[in-house]
Amino acid sequence: AKSPFGEIFIASTDKGICCMEFADEHDAAFNSLRKKFPNAKFTSIVDEVQQNALFIFTQDWSKLKEIKLHLKGTDFQLKVWETLLKIPVGGLTTYGDIAVGINNPRACRAVGTAVGENPVAFLIPCHRVIRASGELGNYHWGEIRKTAMIGWEAAKGEVKRGL
């Protein structure tokens, strides 16, 4: 599907969205998805769950229904991803802030690893995490895309720092 930030691949189960990735190359993205879910049956349809998730990329969120996620990860990863969901639109936070927020202040690097393993791009807003120095830091789908997302969200409202 198309998004303001490029092609996006969305995969869902009957429980919710399990994967959402930016896909510069369709075949490579699909092969990556097949490796992550080797026992899955794939169909090339956009269902209601996926269509609803695409509303996140519109300026009008009035049509957006609750988005259900079906995530698989370690307890630590799930805790980090849950914390990412608390960062407001237009907000930024640091790996250290997240580590403190999950009561593990020395786990900055582990937080960075968990952020990098986020399976649901944009919906779990790992792009809102920056380095303590103010630098953007790494982003799985590229620094240019991360910059564009932060700018797009900032245009929707006031930029905030912290959780």
Predicted regions and their residues:
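Basic nucleic-acid-binding alpha-helical/helix-turn surface characteristic of O6-alkylguanine DNA
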Residues: 1-106, 152-163
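Regulatory, non-catalytic segments
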Residues: 106-121
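Short Lys/Arg-enriched helix C-cap and helix-to-coil transition segments
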Residues: 122-129
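…primarily DNA-binding HTH/wHTH and HhH modules…
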Residues: 132-163
